[in-house]
């Protein structure tokens, strides 16, 4: 954890600094002036960067809005996966869950006065190391080929294309609690399971790092994180469609996903101030600069 005026925790599975009040809009004798976010390893760095920018600009809440308390801005962000973000919200250990997938109906039903704030759009790219020979002879894979690679039916690269070497395919995925895993399972795998030989990365950054360090690796990399590592990984088209802002937004690129902040109850004044910043032109430009697609 680092401490200035902005506090952020990005250790996977780390405990939160404090216990959040139940619900976002509960009335207390003294208004709560810190905000806690927990969840998606894709979205957590975005909220962290936005929190840093917001804090550096204002420092205290009343500098952002004169009606807010004269108190330091304190924002806590912890990365632990989308499912863990929902759980933290339900447990009351976070004010907001960070979710990089659609929230399930069963999850919404458990959250009192469910609130959802869409701050960006992402996609999953099928990424390989640029030194992988497939990057030189193919620029696209079919959904069926991707399924066979990730299920382990294709074990060596020459099974994908006979001109490729007979080296072992190294499959890299997010851990099962990550939003990316659920999106990939729904959009590509269906009822077919990912091979149990897959390397499960604890974060999207770790997944991309595995692809960068192993030329035989393949994984589903966040579009935003892939953009941050441009030149270090090679993104294949899916069914002939490249992942671009246009194809992701219009749905022609099939493995897209929302970036959501999920809460319970009405926003407090300080929460609204930061949420408004995230969805302002400045906040959306920051999200775009990190490689993701803004919602406005």
What are these regions (language model features)?
Residues 17-21:
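C-terminal motif of bacterial Sec signal peptides marking the signal peptidase cleavage site
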Residues 1-10:
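Bacterial N-terminal signal peptides that target proteins for export
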Residues 22-110, 114-296:
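Exported/periplasmic ABC-transporter solute-binding proteins
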